[in-house]
């Protein structure tokens, strides 16, 4: 690093800068993002942490494949408005992995319908 006058940056910061994330969320009312697994490790550098840090008080809904820990406590400690898991109680992990795209699509439709109904008078 010292030989090339390079600078170390977090991968998520590099990516968010490349896609002009801050500019794109400037007028956002809500951010919907995803993370494979949400647990106490998020605060130590998972990609979603960079999104949370840049959200600037914009509500964030996180879609996740797996949650480890108390849902309410995780949401509050991380600064997330809501955490929605794609896997339902009793769903086998092998089924969830095999059908991830359909489950994500169905989950996204549910979130869109919720936002539409909540904001119908906004």
Language-model regions, residue ranges each:
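N-terminal loops that bind phosphate or other acidic moieties
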Residues: 1-122
